[in-house]
Every structure is written in C-alpha cells, then in structure tokens.
Design a protein with these regions (language model features):
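Vicinal oxygen chelate
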Residues: 1-9, 29-123, 133-137
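Short Gly/charged-rich anion-binding patches and loops
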Residues: 17-18, 94
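Conserved active-site tyrosine of GNAT-family acetyltransferases
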Residues: 18-23, 99, 127
Length: 137
C-alpha cells in the first residue's frame, strides 16, 4: 500500500495573523487563500514539501458542531492547550533568530535535548505550540 500524508489541520483564530507568522517567520508558501460560502480555505506549507499542506482552520469550522463545543475549542486555543506542530531545520539558530525577530511568543530557547536533538518552542499568534527541531550529530 502506498499512502502519504496530504494535509493536516491547524486551528487558528485569525487567518491574517497566522499567515504573517508562517510566511514571514518560517518562510512558508501560501498555497491557497480562497473565500467561499462564508468560509476561507487557507493552506500553507514549506517550499521543500510541496505535496503536504497545512490547512489553517478557524475553531470549530464544522457547521454541525454545537455552540458549547465551539466555545470550548476557542477557550482551549486561547489558553494554548491544543497541540501544534513540530518542524525540522538544518539550522536551528538561524530559524530561531528569524522567528524571534517577528516578536513571536518564545516558550523555550534553543537547547540540547537528551534524546539527540536541539530544539526550541514558540507559540503562533493563535497560541498553538510550535517546536522546531534540529538533529545533532
């Protein structure tokens, strides 16, 4: 069987702020930014991985979700309690400096981890935790 990841969804509360962060801080491409039926379909991704998209999705975009669940997702996002994404880079220091220069919320400065990587962590404008990892060795 040949199966590959095509896209993943990341909850954001402001498409424009999220686009600025991922485009300007991480150098991602904006692949789609289309409005339709009162929604906005936005996909981004690293230029080195053209076959994988990250869909920036508002909290509870599913029209069938209850108002209380929509509010709960919004609260979890605001508190930074939803899982984010992990990215790898060959130059963590340069990537960290670029992200820090945008004023991103720094959670962890670059540090060596006991399992063989060097990592930092930041929050995107929506509060998602983003880890950036460089293999050591």
């Amino acid at each position: 069987m040949d199966i590959k990841l095509r896209n993943c969804f990341l909850i954001v509360d402001d498409h424009d702020k999220a686009l600025a962060f991922y485009r300007d801080a991480l150098g991602f491409e904006v692949r789609n930014d289309v409005s339709y039926a009162g929604m906005r379909w936005v996909t981004i991704g690293p230029p080195s991985q053209p076959d994988i998209d990250i869909v920036l999705e508002p909290p509870a975009a599913d029209p069938g979700i209850s108002a209380s669940d929509r509010a709960l997702l919004g609260d979890l996002l605001a508190k930074g309690l939803l899982r984010g994404l992990h990215f790898s880079t060959p130059d963590l220091e340069d990537t960290f400096d670029r992200v820090q220069a945008t004023g991103a919320d720094i959670v962890q400065e670059p540090m060596d981890m006991p399992y063989g990587t060097r990592e930092c962590a930041v929050r995107d404008p929506a509060g998602n935790l983003i880890r950036i990892i460089q293999a050591r060795g």
